[in-house]
Every structure is written in C-alpha cells, then in structure tokens.
C-alpha cells in the first residue's frame, strides 16, 4: 500500500526561492500502534515553496503488515544559522495522511533563510516517539 502527501511550511515573506529538491534518507518504522505486526518505509523530498525561507515535504509511505493502527508522521527541523527549531505532525491511517487529497500545507511557521537540518519521524497519536530510524536531510533555504 502506498500514499503520498505534501507537507508545507509557510512564512510571511515575498521572495521566491530557487531552492533545489532535496531527498531525505528513508525513514524506517515498526511496531505500529494497534497491536499489529506492521512496518513502514517513508520516503520524502523537499518541495520548494513560493515564500523565501519555507519548504514543503512530499511523503511517500509504503506500509506492510497486519492490523496496522493509526500513527503520526512528524517533520522536525532546526535552522543551523539561527538556532530556531520547530516541527509539525499529521495523522496517518495506513498510507493516508490526514489532509484533503493527501496534501498538507500551511503550518504558519518556517525555519527562515539559512541552513536547515530536518528529520522525518513517527510518533504515536499522543506524540510519543515510536521505534524508528529517522529520515534526515540538510539543505539551504534562500
């Protein structure tokens, strides 16, 4: 089973970035809530946004197993130049992100211009980290 989502971070800037698409290392997660025998591979890549200092993340989730419960996928980031850090998570049921058409945008927060370190992680619905190997990427936003 596979699905795709777009995770977007928005900021009130008017510049248009020319940021390249950057691929995260794969996120691997297992022992999904629900008592099932489940595992997922989450592939992700950045998606340039029209506002400077912002980025989106497109996710593709491949899940296998039985009795897989709902969980959350989180994008956690840190601006290495300013030290600002934040993130956002969204509910996943199977491979469906909790958003219209599997597209998530408009977090209302962004790392700003500079070098950014970001991680894709999985958590339970009450935001406790699940067993996972995070997907990581470092990139520069203009």
Language model feature labels by segment:
Residues 21-74:
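Short, surface-exposed binding/anchoring microloops in extracellular/periplasmic proteins
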Residues 11-13, 34, 114:
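Generic detector of short, well-ordered, non-transmembrane alpha-helical segments enriched
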């Amino acid at each position: 089973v596979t699905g795709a989502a777009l995770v977007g971070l928005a900021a009130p800037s008017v510049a248009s970035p020319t940021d390249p698409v950057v691929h995260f290392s794969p996120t691997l997660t297992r022992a999904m809530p629900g008592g099932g025998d489940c595992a997922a591979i989450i592939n992700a890549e950045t998606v340039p946004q029209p506002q400077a200092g912002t980025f989106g993340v497109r996710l593709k989730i491949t899940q296998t197993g039985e009795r897989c419960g709902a969980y959350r996928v989180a994008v956690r980031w840190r601006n290495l130049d300013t030290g600002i850090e934040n993130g956002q998570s969204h509910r996943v049921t199977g491979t469906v992100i909790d958003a219209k058409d599997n597209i998530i945008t408009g977090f209302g927060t962004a790392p700003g211009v500079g070098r950014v370190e970001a991680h894709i992680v999985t958590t339970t619905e009450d935001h406790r980290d699940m067993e996972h190997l995070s997907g990581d990427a470092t990139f520069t936003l203009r």
